[in-house]
Amino acid sequence: MWGPDGEYKNGNLRGVINSLDHIKDLGMNAIWLTPIFDSSKAEGGEKLQATGYFTNNYFEIDPHFGTKQDLKELVDEAHKRNMYVFLDGVFGHHGGVTTPSPSGYTIDCTITGNDRNPDDHGNVRYPQSLDYFKEVATWWIDNYDIDGWRLDQAYQACQNGHNYWLEIRGAVDSLCQKRASEGKKWGTLGYMVGEDWGDAATINKGVFKDGGLQSAFDFQGKERISGPMQKVDSPGLENGFADIVWALRSPRERGYLNDSVMPNLFQTNHDGYRLADHFDLKDPHYYEKQMTRFAVLAAYNGPITLYYGDEFADRTLETTGGQPDNVARTSGHLTPRNSGEAELQSYIADIMAKRRSNPAMWRGKPEFQLTKVGDVSALVVRKTDEATGNEVLIVFADGDTTVPVHRYGGVDVDAWRPEVIVVKEPKF
């Protein structure tokens, strides 16, 4: 992986295998690997090769990262820990693929625009390349038991008024249903989440169009909660806790196509500044303000993503040679460097454990109570899961206070460190 210091970061599949227990202990139930396909001979030089996003062979592993056996071990070990594994698929551009798929399909490499950007310079033409990428999407599931895909610049597969994710997702769904009918546990989820960088309206007419994809990253939610992707001039929450109310409403209420789609909320990804960069290290509530953002993640209905290193408040501003789309690609580590990082890690693990064991956290119907306690602003989010009777409270405050909660009582909250309370345990 090419990083902001102008050098390789030397990460590999073995390093991920060695990190699985750490990831599991954070409360995660899935891993997204940025591209691991062979890019070692890709066009454009080593900086493009090292990103992984310009592959030269979709059916081989980049030797810098390891081998197919390493991937198989990683997937098997993740599954032993009840974690899914998602690969990163770049199905709209590549770095000079010349070999056919195992079934003999090829890519039409004509320089091609797309419905979002007719002047784009993708080098995958649809529908001519459709069979090739249907095979990529299904081959890794059927041969390596992966559980789904993160899809880079997914809008590039929307061409000539047609959303070709409809066919690719259909192929994945059919395979996963077949594998499930055969009694297989893994390689049956078929989760596919698209990167269609924009607001809800952009995604609706892009990868969600005509039911192509069912999940896409929630860029609008990310920027509202934790600030811009490629600037650090705002930490988000510019409208106070009202922005949290907005983020926790249903997809339709936030402008998405309908409530069957699944926006995926995140606070950092590999294309922008890290969450911690938006906060002043000298702020006495530096770590707690990040806890607030992670509490929003934990309370979000639908899928969420946590970027490696954010559990330790890793930063990027100190790096050199960085561009806005690579500053977050920093070297990973598995241990905190100070007590603040240790406390943040522990907080995240705790609230994610509560999310995992309380369905109200990830699918419950929310009620909101915005209030003032003296000079302190507070927000109470009550979430109830109808199927299990599970009920939880998430209480936010911008100062130390006791927040009066309807039908519960007073909740002591430290500034910017939300409390998550299980009011009623789920009955399954």
Please place each PLM-identified region on the residue numbering.
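Hydrophobic faces of well-ordered beta-strands that scaffold small-molecule active sites
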Residues: 31-33, 85-87, 149, 192-194, ...
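A cross-domain feature marking catalytic cores of carbohydrate-active enzymes
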Residues: 35, 87-94, 153-155, 194-197, ...
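Active-site neighborhood of divalent metal-dependent phosphoester/pyrophosphate hydrolases
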Residues: 268-274
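Short, polar loop/linker segments at the starts of domains and inter-domain junctions
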Residues: 2-15, 278-287, 407-408
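A structural motif
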Residues: 28, 145-146, 213, 302-303
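Active-site-proximal helices and loops of the catalytic beta/alpha 8
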Residues: 79, 135-136, 142, 152-259, ...
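Conserved short secondary-structure transition element at the edge of the structured enzyme core
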Residues: 297-312
